[in-house]
């Protein structure tokens, strides 16, 4: 059975000018030589539209509104909600992640934060334990590997 490696690049530079993208590509090529049961799916966060989260998209913390409620919103908002779901589903479908992101101003580029906001969804990638001290529990950690370059 073929597994998926999701390559997430977060740099506006072309690969030949980006150290993080160059190292990531070299790693992926070497990895695929050894593990040929993986296929690569790429997402470039500078080319891909990443929705900015709006309050009306959510019914609860990190929980996108239902399909039925989304239909009550303007088409533009419905499109954004579909994109959020699509990005989250794409992330969930991978067994391994390679993230190529430079360090800018002691952090990573803003599109990566926007992407993380889209994929961190209750009952999909996390669960929220309510109580006096609420806890966030990762759902996918037991079978996923992530390499940040």
Q: What are these language model-derived features?
A:
Residues 1-101, 106-110, 114:
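N-terminal beta1-alpha1-beta2 submodule of the flavodoxin-like/Rossmannoid cofactor-binding fold
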Residues 97-99, 112-135:
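Conserved nucleotide-sugar donor-interacting segment of glycosyltransferase catalytic cores
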Residues 128-149:
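Short, glycine-/small-residue-rich phosphate/pyrophosphate-handling segment
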